[in-house]
Every structure is written in C-alpha cells, then in structure tokens.
C-alpha cells in the first residue's frame, strides 16, 4: 500500500461517490485509533419529524483496531422503537503524519430488528492538517440485501473542514452527498476533559438541504464518553 495508490483511488472514486445513491446524514469519522481506549457513544439525527438514534459501546483491541456495537432506534411520529443492530470496525492504516494524508478504513454490518434485512458498508477515511485547519473525507460503499430489500450497491461522501480554535470548541462545516442527499451546514464540537484520561466529546450541527430530495434542515447531535 502506497500513498500514491490510495490518493489515486480516492480522487477517481470521489465524483462517482457524490453522484450515486446516498447514505443518511450521520457523522464524519476520523482515521485514528487510540490504544486501550473505551467509549460509550450516543448520537441522533432528526429531520422532518423523524428521529434516528444510536447507542453504542466500543473498545480498542490494538493501537490500530477499534470495534463498536450499536443499538439503533427510531422515533417516527408518536412511535419509538428498536430498528436494528450494528457492528462497526475501524482500522487505522497509517501513522499520523506518516504521509501527506492520514488513512483509515471503516467496516459496518447492520441487521434490521426482527427482519432478515442486512446492510454491509465500508468507508475510506482520509484526514489532512494545514496549521489549525483540518480536512476530513469519508468515501462510502454500501451493499443491501435480504427480506423485502432490493439487492443494490450505494455510495456516498461525507466531508468536513474544521478549525482547531481550542480543545473545548472547534467550529466546522460539513457536506453530505449522494443521489438522495445534498446537505451542507455548520457544526460545532469540542472536548471536556476529566481526570485520568477521561473526556466527553460532543458535536452538534444543522445541515441545510441543497436538493428537493433532502430535508430542508437536519439536526445532528453526538455525545461520546471516552475512558
């Protein structure tokens, strides 16, 4: 694996990713793993009266490999119910600063609750720093199959530009692209540190729809306790 090869692949597939079917607006992943880290994560995406929530717990198995399991629940109108389960694996492919761009990979397997519907997704994670600015890109490839699900391959992209103002507050702008998703908007995030390496990471943002198929406004929230 070389930097030139990965960069060429990323530049070739980016236009295809943005033009193809899209994943739901969620979050932007970073390509790093901290050895011995454990976390409990909650996040929510809300649009047009619907709320999708995830509750997960994860741990680093090595200094390059992190795994996390999630419960997925949705509130649609007056109904709140369990929607599915997800297993996520994140792999750090290069050391931070080893190349001009830092590289990682993410693999997710999701199963619908009480249904035989499955979803397998993988993403190439890229991050680059320019002084206080940090640029991050996630390029997704997803395959769905199972009961009452049309077998199909979908792609999407999530992009983030973040300014490292202070550890407690970092403003950013995010873009999510796919055939059914075009959204852009401001995001804020930060870390609240406690003793003995524990911290609370938070994110909040509003993504504005840029196409008729995308909700006018999507709210995303995230809280992640790392220990």
Predicted regions and their residues:
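Cleavable N-terminal export/targeting peptides
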Residues: 1-25
């Amino acid at each position: 694996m070389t930097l030139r090869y990965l960069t060429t692949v990323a530049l070739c597939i980016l236009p295809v990713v943005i033009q193809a079917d899209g994943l739901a607006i969620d979050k932007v992943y970073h390509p790093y793993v901290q050895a011995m880290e454990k976390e409990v994560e909650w996040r929510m995406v809300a649009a047009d009266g619907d709320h999708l929530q995830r509750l997960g717990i994860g741990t680093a198995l090595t200094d390059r490999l992190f795994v996390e399991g999630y419960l997925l629940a949705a509130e649609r109108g007056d109904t709140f119910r369990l929607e599915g389960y997800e297993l996520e694996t994140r792999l750090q492919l290069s050391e931070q600063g080893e190349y001009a761009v830092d590289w990682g990979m993410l693999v997710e397997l999701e199963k619908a609750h009480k249904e035989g519907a499955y979803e397998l997704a993988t993403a190439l994670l890229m991050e680059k720093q320019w002084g206080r600015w940090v640029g991050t890109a996630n390029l997704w490839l997803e395959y769905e199959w199972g009961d009452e699900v049309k077998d199909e391959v979908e792609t999407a992209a999530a992009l983030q530009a973040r300014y490292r103002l202070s550890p407690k507050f970092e403003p950013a702008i995010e873009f999510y692209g796919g055939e059914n998703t075009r959204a852009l908007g401001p995001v804020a995030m930060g870390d609240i540190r406690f003793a003995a390496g524990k911290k609370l990471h938070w994110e909040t943002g509003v993504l504005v729809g840029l196409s008729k198929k995308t909700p006018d406004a999507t709210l995303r929230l995230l809280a992640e306790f790392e220990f």
